[in-house]
Amino acid sequence: TCALPIFQVADSLSALILHYHIESGYENHQKLVFSPNTATQFNQLQHDRHDTPMETYPWKKVEIPSAELGNRGVLFAGIGWYTRLEFPYLNDIMEQGEYVHIEKAGLRIYPEYGTYSGYNTLPDSIFLYIADENNVVTDAVKDYLGKQVQGGKLVKDDVFLGNTYYYFDVTQFMKDELGTSGKYKHNLQLVFNSDDYTKTLRNLTFSDTKGQHPITLQLNYKIYESY
């Protein structure tokens, strides 16, 4: 394992002081003061995929199925990872009647227990954007007024940690997607906010539909028949 040393400088009065001594016939104690630059600076970020499920994949512009990651989805700021969510079987509910109307749709995403801690904390919000078949973002999942980008609500369970989840109301998206096919279908991109991607190493791991705490889409819908 490798350590990632991080510290913050509150103001220009902070300093890193190196104390040392020079060997000679008498005591010769010295110190070297490193005065910090309080401006934000980025040098380089590298990551090693050796001995991981991602080892065989190219480094850029590649889609990795969740099945190849142990049935997991991963978000990782700094290196730009996000997760695409698809709903290939949504239209199957149309077979249940002549007309189907979605009343409500809720998406729950369960962070994998053990991948976060008091130090590597869960973000208060994550976000969903709507993208076409070429992963071009066309819109965002918004609040019930249709104005603000909806941040997934973090619901914590401090007793049964596996019950901690993010909740999204995706009713309008599912209504729009029902009955579409081919190039008219869309997916959802699960992401952090832009500041997290450019300024942090925040990360999130969660299960797909086959994981220990699977991602869940709950649909409430009505079926109509003509007699």
Label for each model-derived stretch:
Residues T1-Y227:
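Secreted, disulfide-rich extracellular signaling modules
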